Amino acid sequence: MKPSRLSSLDPVKMPEWRWAPFLSHAINAFIPLKPEPYPVAPEFLQREGKTGSKSQPIRVTTCTWACRTKKFRQVRAACVEAGRSASVLNFVINPYHTFDLPFFGADLVTLPSGHLLALDLQPAITSDERHTKQVWERLMPIFEHWRVHLPEGGPIPEEAKPYFSPGFLWTRLPLSIEGNQLIDEVIMPAFKDYLNLYLDLVEMAEEVSPQRAFKLLEGQKRYLSYRAKKDPARAMLARFHGHQWTESYIHNVLFDL
């Protein structure tokens, strides 16, 4: 059978996938940046699996959309559709370490227990004001504008705090008409605002000195190492596609620096 996706830039086509409008908006926003395919092994471009019971199996599709640009080392979207079991968009922008930029992160997850939704511009070096000040000054008004419309998602583990900004927008919503309305009326415009700010920061960013670039690279490596070690999707992906595939996907695609 011919693979349905041959390039990381090929469209992600998953009927009923909840998060398609979010990825579509992001992809359109990248068009002026002239994105090129990011190298992703064929077995990770699209993977089919099953979950559920023998009598009521549920089809699982996992796709990876990815690109790179002049200032982005890797932009990647991990997309999962598993019917009533899960619907996921994990979207991360990894800038080149030669630019003093944070990561962009969006984690949009639907599980049987509800929606878990998070947006952030995540710092590579939290303690470095040169790295964070200009970002947080512009991010916090956006965060404050949208946070009042959403319930709190809960506390952040102490060990994770260095990897998030004060503008970490994090909420849990019920599987209900009200939850869907908040996704459409709050989460989607917040996603657009966070992404617009990020792309504005990227446009203004200029290359840094080799010494500064080395410091940023070390910060990026710490962040990605932590994310790979603590990836909350690990158990779900292993259940859908097996342990070996999942570990390779996490370390060689999602957090590959």
Swiss-Prot record:
Record has Transmembrane helix as a keyword: no
UniProt key word Oxidoreductase: yes
This protein's UniProt keywords: Oxidoreductase
InterPro entries reported for this sequence: Ferredoxin-dep_bilin_Rdtase (IPR009249), Phycoerythrobilin_Fdx_Rdtase (IPR022827)
Primary enzyme class: oxidoreductase
Disulfide-bonded cysteines: none
Catalytic activity reported: (3Z)-phycoerythrobilin + oxidized 2[4Fe-4S]-[ferredoxin] = 15,16-dihydrobiliverdin + reduced 2[4Fe-4S]-[ferredoxin] + 2 H(+)
Transmembrane segment boundaries: none
Task of the protein: Catalyzes the two-electron reduction of the C2 and C3(1) diene system of 15,16-dihydrobiliverdin.
UniProt family annotation: Belongs to the HY2 family.
Name of protein: Phycoerythrobilin:ferredoxin oxidoreductase
Species name: Prochlorococcus marinus (strain MIT 9313)
